């Protein structure tokens, strides 16, 4: 069963690999590294000691913005995206976050995941 853990500096190379494979217009390694700090809730999805995906989320007061979410394309379609997003939302609720914002292109297939989870 997969688990969620905070992202660490040592994860960045693997996250960058996933980012490059999962997105048509991927973030640079520098952008990934710059989206960390006390105002972020960044999680990695791990199963059998392998990082399969991640979420980058910034929090401000009682709101959060999901900046990036990615699952290794080899692992897509197995429910990992739902697990990651639901886990992120649960952790945000624990922190008192009431609202999660995100921006998504209408053509992005992940839109259906976002709609499904509300």
Predicted feature locations:
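Conserved GNAT acetyl-CoA-binding A-motif
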Residues: 92-103, 113
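Conserved acetyl-CoA-binding loop of GNAT-fold acetyltransferases
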Residues: 115-118
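Acetyl-CoA-dependent GNAT
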Residues: 2, 6-74, 82-87, 91-95
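Short Asp/Glu-rich motifs
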Residues: 38, 111-112
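Short glycine/proline-centered loop/turn elements that form peptide/ligand docking sites
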Residues: 81, 85, 107-110
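Amphipathic alpha-helical segments that mediate coupling or scaffolding at interfaces
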Residues: 34-35, 103, 107
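Helix-turn-helix DNA-binding elements, focusing on the entry/boundary residues of the two helices
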Residues: 66, 110-111
